Amino acid sequence: MIIVLSPAKSLDYETPPHVSHHTQPQFADDAAALIDELRRLSPQQIATLMSISDPLARLNFQRYADWSRASTPANAKQAVLAFNGDVYEGLDARSLSPDDLDYAQRHVRVLSGLYGLLRPLDLLQPYRLEMGTRFSNARGKDLYAFWGERITHALNAELKTRVGASRVLVNCASAEYFKSVKPKLLDARVVTPVFEDWKDGRYKIISFHAKRARGLMARYVVEGRIDSPDALKDFASEGYAFDASASNDDTYVFRRRAGA
């Protein structure tokens, strides 16, 4: 079983990693090709393209200039320790043991606009490039065209090694990022957990809580060494519980009545 996550815009390069083991991104050459094209943009063009402030555009202009094809512990950090958004607060990889991270390395993947597909311990240099960015490039009109079927083929290569009930892709990514995967071409069952909170008299998806819950689900999979979709239904972190009446074979709905 493989669980896929979205990346985070917020990054942490201040906290030293608690493990030294690291790996190299599979699509580093593709990332380098994108960086070459991004370096042609001025800070003003970056601000317009990404709808970000001028200071943030200047920061990323410098990030692209500093980016190196060679990722080392001196200029990069393990992806799961560098990402710092809501999902990663739920995952809390900094508190995972080396054995947990080793399991995550085999069962967790992060979709990325720049790197395509990352393992948790792949070295990540600072960047900002959301998958939904309409960045025209040598391969097409946007990043979905750039990545094409590459991400799907990479996932299939890994899923091919799984057998039976473990040949499952658990989609804990956002719609923006999962659009880079071609489910019809996947040689696996896709299960999507959905997290809803009770608010204003009904259950609804609340973005902040749902993002955190995706990270909590990934942590549950890692710590519990979960390798079958049925075991996902026992997830009960921070008050969530599986609701069979709202779920089906492809979508597992987890609900809670109060905040964490």
Curated annotation (Swiss-Prot):
NCBIfam families: PRK02101.1-1, PRK02101.1-3. Signal peptide: none annotated. Transmembrane segments: none annotated. One of its GO terms (cellular component) is cytosol. It holds the Pfam family H2O2_YaaD. The lineage of its organism: Bacteria, Pseudomonadati, Pseudomonadota, Betaproteobacteria, Burkholderiales. GO terms for biological process: response to hydroperoxide. Belongs to the UPF0246 family. It comes from the Bacteria. InterPro entries: YaaA. This is UPF0246 protein BPSL1241.
